[in-house]
Amino acid sequence: ELAAPGGRVMSATPGNNYDRQSGTAEASAQVAGIAALVRQRVATDPAFAGKSAAEKNALVSNFLMGTAHPLADATREDGTFYSPRRVGAGLVDAVAATTSPVYPTVVGAADPSRPKADLGDGTQGWTFQVNLTNVSDTAHTYSLGGQVLSENV
């Protein structure tokens, strides 16, 4: 659902040493740490005081995925982004996920804690509704853009 740096990350190794490691262990450790920070924010922010434990868990995912950044495919010169099938919502952003006053939800999503449109592989058109919830006293304006994404075949 998210991407994080996982290549040549400085990691702890046996014997009180450090070395550059690559793989999902490095990427998942970063996402887990950022998720813990978002969970702390949701647990302590008065804006979420009335939420149930399940709702707070969903908020963590909503903030993580809703503030992630699309990743451009470095093998292409046209700036095309990687498909969400490869990188999920995009590159996780710790600062945005822990400070954003707005989080998205998708009405009718297969999993309410995942702000994404489940399009499947059908050939029909799709309609979905994205709600943006503002937990601050400041108004925010967003512009919706779109880009068709596909896998390199």
How should these model regions be labeled?
Residues 49-50, 80-153:
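Secreted peptidase-domain scaffold signal
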Residues 4-78:
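Hydrolase catalytic cores
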Residues 1-4, 65, 85-89:
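Mature extracellular/periplasmic domains of secretome proteins
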